């Protein structure tokens, strides 16, 4: 099953060299306020027209510890790597932004649960063979990925979709990281309560960001 407008990755063999990713990629990420605003709009559209909406929440494993070891410049390098990989494996209409705690939120319009899994696995697979350069040293990265999708009108609230993605990500990280976990899988493992407890502050916004932001104003790297 192919999503409309899928953009194939750039050709090339060998191990990906994330440090060579163009610097402008990290500046193309939406801020947290912007991506949440855009996701809310897409959720409303999906509910209104009965079309699917996929959500991917991604976090680089052990990033705080790696930054402590290799320096703060690694965070910018990782941001470029994530932006580059997602750009290659998604469509131009898909939306990527940063959230709290160095996480990345990817919103996939017109994408059902099965297609969301395919996109997430493609992104995860790239990271399994990726190196970034840090002070002339090659550093391997891995990512934990939580996914969910709104395939019909059963999901009533925008916040529920965020909580589902967060729950799935927590399971992926709690199981050792370096894997993709769907919210549906967490409900099978933990029963109907949806899995691990969630923090109400995970997606809390400062008061000055609660007003609708201008999505055209991208945050710099």
Q: What do these predicted ranges mean?
A:
Residues 76, 91-92, 102-109, 133:
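Flexible loop/N-cap segments at domain edges
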Residues 8-31:
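Amphipathic HAMP/coiled-coil signal-transducing linker helices
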Residues 68, 107-112, 128, 150-151:
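Residue-level recognition of strand-loop junctions within catalytic nucleotide-signaling folds
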Residues 95-98, 139:
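A short pre-motif secondary-structure segment
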Residues 24-40, 47-54, 61-87, 97-101, ...:
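Conserved long alpha-helical elements within nucleotide-processing catalytic cores of c-di-GMP signaling
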Residues 114, 118, 150-167, 171-211, ...:
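Catalytic cores and conserved motifs of cyclic dinucleotide signaling enzymes
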Residues 45, 88-93, 126-137, 171:
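Short catalytic/binding micro-motifs of nucleotide second-messenger systems
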Residues 104, 143-147:
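A structural signal for short, well-ordered beta-strand segments
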């Amino acid at each position: 099953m192919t999503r409309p407008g899928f953009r194939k990755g750039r050709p090339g063999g060998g191990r990906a060299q994330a440090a060579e990713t163009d610097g402008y990629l990290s500046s193309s990420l939406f801020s947290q306020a912007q991506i949440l605003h855009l996701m809310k709009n897409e959720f409303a559209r999906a509910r209104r027209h009965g079309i699917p909406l996929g959500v991917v929440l991604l976090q680089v494993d052990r990033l705080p510890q790696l930054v402590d070891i290799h320096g703060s410049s690694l965070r910018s390098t990782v941001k470029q790597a994530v932006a580059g990989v997602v750009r290659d494996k998604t469509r131009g209409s898909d939306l990527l932004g940063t959230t709290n705690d160095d996480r990345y939120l990817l919103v996939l319009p017109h994408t059902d649960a099965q297609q969301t899994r395919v996109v997430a696995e493609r992104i995860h697979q790239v990271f399994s063979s990726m190196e970034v350069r840090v002070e002339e040293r090659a550093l391997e990265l891995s990512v934990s990925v939580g996914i969910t999708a709104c395939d019909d009108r059963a999901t009533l609230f925008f916040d529920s979709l965020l909580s589902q993605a967060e729950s799935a990500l927590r399971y992926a990280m709690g199981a050792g990281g370096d894997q993709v976990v769907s919210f549906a899988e967490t409900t099978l493992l933990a029963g109907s309560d949806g899995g691990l407890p969630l923090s109400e502050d995970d997606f809390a916004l400062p008061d000055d960001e609660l007003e609708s932001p201008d999505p055209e104003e991208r945050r710099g790297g």
